[in-house]
Amino acid sequence: MAGGSILGTRVQRKEDPKFLTSGGVYADDVDDPRLANAAQAVYVRSAVAHGTILSIDIDSALEMPGVLAIHTAESLGLEPVASPFNPASARTLLASDKVRHVGEPVAVVVAETQQQATDAAEMVFVDYDFLPALVDLEEALASDTLVYDAAGSNAVFDTTALGLPENTPAEEFFADCEVTVTGRFMNQRVAPCPLEVRASAATWDGGRLVQWISSQGAQGAKDAFTAANGGDAEAIHLITPDVGGGFGAKIDTYAEELLLGPLAKQLGRPVRWRETRSESMMQLGHGRAQLQYVTIGGTKDGKVTHYQLHAIQDAGSFVGMGTILAPFMTRPMASGVYDIPNIEVRTTSVVTNTTPTTAYRGAGRPEATAAIERAMDLFAHEIGQDPAEVRRKNLIAKFTEPHTTAVGQVY
């Protein structure tokens, strides 16, 4: 494999026989002696998109059969965790002051069986003071209602803050164009839906946390677990067995996984958790969710010379990976396969009362492709030419030396 590239190289697959015959071993399949007599955790989730928590009543749930413990953020002593991308957007692993999307964990029930924990979770009553739910990006940008009061705005990140000089007024940027056309595109939100839902199991062995997790990024997960458990990486043994699909969403580490260690320590026995398909749809990080404003300009004979893209990224209710990753991956792919000499890309990330977004199959790159291809169609329609012919005129010419696009990508 010359230069480490798989292009033009036959790649032998070695992992298939196990999955086609005896089958893989996934996080919920793990049968380790250290997990003997494991209790089962089920999370109580918000049924509202946005609201202040007035009270959490667990009294009736504590009387349910098989219940071993019920915890809230207060009983676990959880402190707010600040986002590295926007410190003012801090939250606890279990919602404490208010809930910010449907499905956000509010409390956790630990019982002898999963069914007992599920039944008891139904008996936890949360009283809310309802707040306006922001589910539309443009509405969230204009609204006085804030997802995070301390942030001061629902726009929690903008590439202009990094000093990227890509915010030229349109009338100036497109001044030399014979033709300009604008568009507003919505690259819709998607849920990853891997065949294997999230699952995890935790136990303590000689003062060391041992935890199995379905993850695409074991080292990143190790960092998250270390931060959540006192900062001693040597005190954590994280194991990732076979993973039944993730599509990017399992790169993140989630509250439900991070809380199992403290629950197991408090209970003095192993604790397991497996989400339902409904929970996966609500809480496993979503993808895409990008609103795109495009302006494309050029000559009447079909040469595109200028292109501006302002991408509004829906971060969901948490300022996490989706806030940064997708927008940053959109920018370098903005030109697509076309030789467009003048390109500006600005991205703004906005929090809403929806499931947080994260990496998903390409993470910003397919969004960039969709934007430029739709813009090319608009341009072709405006000048009355065949879209295929307009594309042909603007394709990057055959090159032998490295080619650098207007957004800095080297081919």
Predicted segments — roles?
Residues 1-159, 183, 266:
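Flexible, low-hydrophobicity surface segments
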Residues 43-73, 108-128, 200-267, 324-333, ...:
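Alpha-helical support elements that line or immediately flank enzyme active sites
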Residues 146-229, 395-411:
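Helix-loop-helix junctions that connect adjacent transmembrane helices in secondary transporters/permeases
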Residues 71-104, 139, 145-150, 220, ...:
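Short, surface-exposed loop/turn segments at secondary-structure boundaries that line and modulate
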Residues 69-73, 101, 181-185, 211-213, ...:
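General beta-strand structural signal in soluble alpha/beta enzymes
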